[in-house]
Structures are given as structure tokens and as C-alpha cells.
Amino acid sequence: MGSRFLLALFLVLLVLGYEVQGSQQIQQDEAGSLALLNKLPESLSSYWDIAKAAVGDLYEKTYLTSVDEKLRDMYSKSSAAVSTYAGIFTDQILTLLKGE
């Protein structure tokens, strides 16, 4: 029991020490963090555009009509099944709420 208590105490003191260091660094880095936050949306947008372009190029290179037809067929069948089961689920919920 004593070793667990000492371990817990050590971890608490370690976390508190990092909190004190972190609060001092936050005051120093506020200007830098604001600039970083301003750059973040721009970099995310550029990464998203690059990823979209890469996927589009890959799709154009590997386009097969038979695969495309199969994908469209699977999508239509699965969306029909999902809408059917969603309707059944909705009816069940309404029946439970009304108490019929």
C-alpha cells in the first residue's frame, strides 16, 4: 500500500510541476500561438485541396465502367434497405411513444 501511495503522490507532484511550467510558457507563447492559429485553417484547407486532387486523379486513372456500375447498383440497393429499416425503426419509436 505504501508504494502505491508514493507512486500516486509522485504522479500528482509531477503533473503539478508541469502545470506550473505550462502556465509560464503560455504567457510567453501567446503571440506565437495566435499566429499559429491563424495559419491552421489555411494549411488544413490546402491539405484538403491536395487530397481531393490526388483522389480525383487516382479515380480517373483507375476508372472502370463495370466497377462503376456495380458501385452504383450496390449504393441504390443499400440506400433502399436503409430507408426501409429507418421507416420501420421510426414506426416502432412512434408506437412506443404513443403507447398504442
UniProtKB/Swiss-Prot annotation:
Lipoprotein lipase cofactor: annotated segments: 78-100
Residue ranges, annotated region (Lipid binding): 66-74
GO molecular function, one term: phospholipase binding
Keywords linked to the UniProt accession: Chylomicron, HDL, LDL, Lipid degradation, Lipid metabolism, Lipid transport, Secreted, Signal, Transport, VLDL
Stretch forming the signal peptide: 1-22
InterPro entries found in the cross-reference section: Apo-CII (IPR008019), ApoC-II_dom_sf (IPR023121)
Its biological purpose: Component of chylomicrons, very low-density lipoproteins (VLDL), low-density lipoproteins (LDL), and high-density lipoproteins (HDL) in plasma. Plays an important role in lipoprotein metabolism as an activator of lipoprotein lipase.
Identification of the protein by name: Apolipoprotein C-II
Family per similarity comment: Belongs to the apolipoprotein C2 family.
Pfam family, one: Apo-CII
Post-translational modification: Proapolipoprotein C-II is synthesized as a sialic acid containing glycoprotein which is subsequently desialylated prior to its proteolytic processing.
GO cellular-component term (any): high-density lipoprotein particle
Encoding gene, per UniProt annotation: Apoc2
Keyword Cytoplasm appears in the UniProt entry: no
Subcellular localization(s) per the UniProt record: Secreted
Main subcellular localisation: secreted
GO BP field: lipid catabolic process; lipid transport; positive regulation of phospholipid catabolic process
